[in-house]
Structure formats: C-alpha cells, structure tokens
Amino acid sequence: MARVKRAVNAHKKRRTMLERASGYRGQRSRLYRKAKEQMLHSFTYNYQHRHKRKGDFRRLWITRINAAARANGMTYNRFMQGLKLAGVEVDRRMLAEIAVSDAATFAVLVKTAREALPADVNAPAASR
C-alpha cells in the first residue's frame, strides 16, 4: 500500500479554518487549535440563534398587533379569538404589517373580530 502524505490537505484544512476565524480577537484568529475551538462554538451559537430569531420575530409581531388592537379598543387575546371565530386566516406577520402600515384596514379587521365575538365578551368589564 502506498504511503499517503497529508501536507497539502492538512495545510488546506488549517488555512480554511483560519480564514473562517478571521475577525476574532487574539489567538482565536491566529492559532489553529484556538481558532478551531472558537469556530465549533460559533457554529453552535449560529444554529441556536437562527431558531431563536423566529421566536423573537413572533414576539415582535404580537407586541405590534396588541398595541394596534388596544388603540382600537380591544385586547390582543379577544382580537385573535374574534378573527378565528370570523374565519379570517391572516397570520401574525401580515397582521403586524397591516397594523404598522395601514391603520384603516386594521380597524376593519378589529370591527370584524368584534362582530364575531359573542355579545357578553364585547361588554365592558364593569357590567359583566
């Protein structure tokens, strides 16, 4: 069996890792072992935060919808319940966009949600 020399592959692997680690401070961008360790952590953080970002955006959309719904005299909870009962299938992302960019359309959606709710839910809290 022939002897395999690894010089070319090893240098390429190390060069690639150091190129990926450029921009880090100190030894983490200059020494292979430190750079490799940092890159493994970086990949982990990257994976976690890609998934965390989805929840962050959902929270942002809910906050925007809630603010717009309260400006129209309704809470987020009742608004979403009313839309579901009315059969309106618009996701939170689009609702948040409508709330920010088109207040008149959002007011129509609030009216639709309010009409779909049972009568006792629409009554003020003091009269229940």
Swiss-Prot record:
InterPro entries: Ribosomal_bL20 (IPR005813), RIBOSOMAL_L20_CS (IPR049946), Ribosomal_protein_bL20_C (IPR035566). It comes from the Bacteria. Keywords: Ribonucleoprotein, Ribosomal protein, RNA-binding, rRNA-binding. One of its GO terms (cellular component) is ribosome. Gene3D superfamilies: 6.10.160.10, Ribosomal protein L20. GO terms for biological process: ribosomal large subunit assembly; translation. GO terms for molecular function: rRNA binding; structural constituent of ribosome. The keyword Ribosomal protein applies. Pfam families: Ribosomal_L20 (PF00453). Belongs to the bacterial ribosomal protein bL20 family. PANTHER family: 39S RIBOSOMAL PROTEIN L20. Binds directly to 23S ribosomal RNA and is necessary for the in vitro assembly process of the 50S ribosomal subunit. It is not involved in the protein synthesizing functions of that subunit. This is Large ribosomal subunit protein bL20. The lineage of its organism: Bacteria, Bacillati, Actinomycetota, Actinomycetes, Micrococcales. The gene is rplT.
